[in-house]
Amino acid sequence: MKDQHNVRGKASRKSAPNFSRRDFLYGSAAGAASAAMLNPAMAAAQSVGVKPGDLPDLTIKEVKVYVTDMTNIHRLNGTETGELVSVVTHSGIEGNYTIGNRNHTTGWLDWAKATLVGKSVTDLLPTLASTSGMKGPGGFDASSFGRPGAGGRTPPGFGTEPQRPGEGPAFGGAAVAGSALQTHGGGLWPNYYIAAADVCLWDILGKAVNRPIYKILQGGVNNRDRVMAYASSNHLPAIEDYVPDALKAKELGYKGYKIHPGRGQHRTGPEIPTYVGHMEIIREIRKAVGDEFVLMHDPVQMYNRFEALSVGRLLDELDYLWFEDPIRTIDEEGLIELGQKLHLPMHVGEFLYSIADYAEYIKRDALGAVRLISDNVGGISGSMRVGLLADAHGLECAPHNWGNEYDMMVAFHLELALPSAYWFEVPHPVEYTDRPYLKNKFRIDKDSYILAPTDPGLGLPIDRAALDKVTKQILR
């Protein structure tokens, strides 16, 4: 027996594969993305077969803001004021992103001058979105959609506690320190400040090696070059508006449609409970588009627990794909209860602002899939950390996507790079996202896919003449 044991042991050791640390890190999509997050400059250089020292000078020389005229441009985010931020290196490479959605551009410029200028992209990227942020779920009242609320975007006291360091099996060292996370659509600093800078830095890094950002994040392992798109509705005025809108999306070639319900009222007639009107929309759309068409429902935290359970049971019955933000994110116990009583997954997370919060909600089964808003979680870097945390726990990660082409492109690079992202949200109609100074537009192909960009960085080359026409002022 002893000899047999020794023989088996020797054979086992002889046949065991000899994995290096590099093989382990780069052997899977999640591992390659994690390695890219630990050392973005190394990942970028390796994507073109050079050393980090061979990259051009990526020291930040200047930050500025283009203030554009939004008079004739449709705004999906009502707070969008049209600012385009710019970060420029000594080698002349420019990174861009929008911060006009947050309406805090002047403060960002002062912060960016002090934080970025004179420092290298290669030094900033691993740590910029790993600084201390704010902890605590948030939310807003839905009174404008027919439900009473306190009138505030975020409840008093939220976002005041110190953030706990992020803890997740996908990261180590500086990358695990947690994203600096805050609020969306006019939230507090530092999250959206950092997010705008982080995206610009990734845009620069991609341009420095002539590669799209997602290629750097994929690490040569995940070769996805397209993502299935679904049409995401606006909050429409009346119940009668939804069926034509969904049928139009189907006619355009989309394979799915997400309902953002409005007040839940008919154009004429007596007022009814909002959630009852939403249930009518849910039934009528399923009847109109057929059983094979994919449908989702996102009331944006509009319901109480009873309403959410009533709506959720109908969604289950009619085979909807997911139920998004059914109740306020702060109601963690309510989310757990709904998850236990409903079959379809609940997409939750747009109003979480730290990786510690995501870890808690995942641990407690308070969500069935992870949603995130990149501006809330530190840009591309913070979003990748949250997405890989989700993947490590076997959960889908679905980035929120609502705004202009810059917002959309960040979400698209994330979906191309994350191993557990499957559907790409496209505001309907998509023309509302277009900006006249950006050459590339988001449009689905005949099979409802959005194809990956081929231009370097974010993949949004600027038409300088068109930008000049709409620029009212350049802030420096």
Segments the model singles out, each with a brief description of its role:
Residues 107, 114, 123, 313, ...:
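Shared catalytic-loop signature of beta/alpha-barrel
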Residues 192, 198-236:
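Glycine-rich, aromatic-flanked loop segments that form ligand/cofactor-binding clefts
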Residues 438-476:
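C-terminal extensions of enzymes
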